[in-house]
């Protein structure tokens, strides 16, 4: 099957290649009001500029926004086969605060700036400035629950006004990591031609997690189900994913390693700079359209695709097959075929994986390790069996997810009274007597104000003693499991409400508190 036509019929690569025109835009950019992009906006801009979001040529104006929210369609681009607006399920918007919105008018041109290095990336010509109904957007697009990560971002972080308009691209956002693997839609289509895959089927596998043996098995089976000459694109997200996910550096190292475990010529890897919304069925449709633009004709969609877990009622935000059902509804408008994700399980007696729907689990012994179990094994240093993951992959995961005995921690001590200082010295002396490589560092009050620095020290494996009257920001950075909070007794202002370990301190129990903290650290596996 030939490489599919991009969504909307044309790949929209918006970065100006003409040198004189680019120089003209750079000069103009120096005279224009500047808007520094957020991390999410930066991801969105990159995929607008490189064509990953084709047919979009800018951030949505008000008419397109309303149509996408209510009908999953653009109003400005029509589907030639049915005359309806072209499918587009996720609103791609440039949010700003009210003050910024009042500085601009329709017809103005503004330059969009990279937050990391202040590089001018694009010039936007404003078509509309509007205040969206955020509650309606939350309800229609992400089902309304306040605990949905996209709704939390929408209602608590995003600006209250949107600016829509066409873009002229000056530069792509600059990346310094895994540059060869960050292929644009144009580059990936060219690679498929070079590999000789252009007339053959290609199935894309989306992931935001590390890959293990089961993932290799299911992707190979998906390719085999499509046909003898099908190939695999491992296309992980390295933009913004779900809070708490394993960092993309660790994951990319895993993907590169597992790629070597596929038969020669079967699979390739490319990284997608997408800011996920964890939008379930709508997001699955969005992912499929994006893969069409990247030149893929098949896409694996699994149970609860792009779902963020449980809602505020303790129930999954999305049904297990909502994504597959929505994609089936619009099948005749897609240039990509959906491959249902087939769960596989390990058969210990036969030393092989098999689709779970092909075996009788009452008669055949199976084995599996859940994500929670894997995290616990990494935390405790317990063995991760080779049937589950390759030793090379486990080694990578252990390097960035060491067992508790090698992890750092922060002890946050209320320093509103001298007793906090006494405890800091006592703890540093006590903990330094234990064997091991962990350093015990005591910060001063000025250093303690920088929660980022504390977080980096903990990541590096240090035990950090922090004098502070406001532990919450540090707990949020370090994480509950690696934080201890010591309050002055009867001081109600100190409780963070977040840390796993909280201790009270009074004049007569300094030694007792030291013993409590040491025992807690031992119970948690730090010693």
Swiss-Prot record:
Residue ranges of the region described as N-terminal: 1-176
GO annotation, cellular component aspect: cytoplasm
E.C. no: 2.7.7.4
Pfam families the UniProt entry points to: ATP-sulfurylase, PUA_2
TM ranges: none
Binding residues annotated for sulfate, in chain numbering: 206, 208, 306
Region spans: Required for oligomerization: 407-527
Marked site (Induces change in substrate recognition on ATP binding) residue numbers: 341
Residues annotated as catalytic: 207, 208, 209
Keywords, ordered alphabetically: Amino-acid biosynthesis, ATP-binding, Cysteine biosynthesis, Cytoplasm, Methionine biosynthesis, Nucleotide-binding, Nucleotidyltransferase, Transferase
Subcellular location: Cytoplasm
MF annotations from Gene Ontology: ATP binding; sulfate adenylyltransferase (ATP) activity
Chain segments carrying region Catalytic: 177-406
Annotated site, Transition state stabilizer, chain positions: 212, 215
Catalytic activities: sulfate + ATP + H(+) = adenosine 5'-phosphosulfate + diphosphate
One GO term of the biological process aspect: methionine biosynthetic process
Family: Belongs to the sulfate adenylyltransferase family.
UniProt-listed HAMAP family: Sulf_adenylyltr_euk
Domain note: The oligomerization domain is distantly related to APS kinases, but it is not functional and does not bind APS. It is required for oligomerization of the enzyme, although the oligomerization state has no effect on the catalytic activity of the enzyme.
The protein's role, per its UniProt record: Catalyzes the first intracellular reaction of sulfate assimilation, forming adenosine-5'-phosphosulfate (APS) from inorganic sulfate and ATP. Plays an important role in sulfate activation as a component of the biosynthesis pathway of sulfur-containing amino acids.
Protein name: Sulfate adenylyltransferase
Source species of the chain: Candida albicans (strain SC5314 / ATCC MYA-2876) (Yeast)
Gene: MET3
């Amino acid at each position: 099957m030939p490489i599919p036509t991009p969504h909307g019929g044309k790949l929209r690569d918006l970065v100006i290649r003409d040198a004189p025109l680019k120089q003209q835009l750079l000069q103009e950019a120096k005279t224009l009001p500047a808007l520094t992009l957020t991390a999410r906006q930066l991801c969105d801009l990159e995929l607008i500029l490189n064509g990953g979001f084709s047919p979009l040529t800018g951030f949505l104006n008000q008419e397109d926004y309303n149509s996408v929210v209510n009908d999953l369609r653009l109003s400005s681009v029509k589907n030639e086969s049915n005359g309806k607006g072209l499918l587009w399920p996720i609103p791609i918007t440039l949010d700003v605060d009210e003050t910024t919105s009042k500085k601009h008018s329709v017809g103005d041109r503004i330059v969009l700036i990279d937050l990391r290095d202040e590089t001018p990336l694009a010039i936007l010509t404003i078509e509309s400035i509007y205040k969206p109904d955020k509650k309606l957007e939350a309800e229609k697009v992400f089902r309304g629950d306040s605990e949905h990560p996209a709704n939390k971002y929408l209602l608590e972080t995003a600006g209250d006004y949107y600016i829509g308009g066409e873009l002229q691209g000056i530069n792509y956002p600059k990346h310094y990591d895994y540059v060869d693997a960050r292929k644009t839609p144009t580059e990936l289509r060219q690679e498929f031609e070079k590999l000789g895959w252009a007339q053959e089927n290609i199935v894309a596998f989306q992931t935001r997690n590390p890959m293990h043996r089961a993932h290799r098995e299911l992707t190979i089976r998906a390719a085999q189900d499509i046909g003898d000459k099908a190939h695999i694109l491992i296309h992980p997200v390295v933009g913004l994913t779900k809070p708490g996910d394993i960092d993309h550096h660790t994951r990319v190292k895993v993907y590169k390693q597992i790629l070597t475990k596929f038969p020669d010529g079967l699979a390739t890897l490319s990284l997608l700079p997408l800011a996920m919304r964890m939008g379930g069925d709508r997001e699955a449709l969005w992912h499929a359209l994006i893969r069409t633009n990247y030149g893929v004709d098949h896409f694996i969609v699994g149970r609860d695709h792009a779902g963020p877990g449980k809602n505020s009622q303790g129930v999954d935000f999305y049904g297990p097959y909502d994504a597959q059902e929505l994609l089936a509804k619009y099948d005749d408008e897609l240039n990509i075929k959906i491959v249902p994700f087939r769960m596989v399980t390990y058969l210990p007696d036969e030393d092989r994986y098999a689709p779970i729907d092909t075996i009788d689990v009452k008669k055949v012994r199976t084995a599996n390790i859940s994500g929670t179990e894997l995290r616990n094994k990494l935390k405790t240093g317990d063995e991760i069996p080779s049937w589950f993951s390759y030793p090379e992959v486990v080694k990578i995961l252990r390097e960035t997810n060491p067992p508790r005995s090698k992890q750092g921690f922060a002890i946050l001590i209320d320093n509103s009274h001298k007793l906090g200082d006494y405890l800091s010295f006592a703890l540093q002396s006590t903990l330094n007597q234990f064997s091991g490589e962990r350093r015990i560092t005591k910060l001063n009050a000025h250093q303690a104000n920088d929660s980022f620095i504390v977080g980096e020290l903990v990541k590096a494996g240090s035990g950090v003693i922090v004098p502070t009257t406001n532990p919450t920001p540090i707990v949020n950075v370090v994480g509950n499991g690696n934080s201890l909070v010591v309050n002055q007794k009867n001081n109600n202002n100190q409780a963070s409400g977040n840390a796993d370990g909280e201790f009270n301190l009074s004049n007569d129990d300094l030694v007792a508190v030291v013993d409590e903290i040491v025992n807690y650290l031992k119970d948690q596996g730090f010693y």
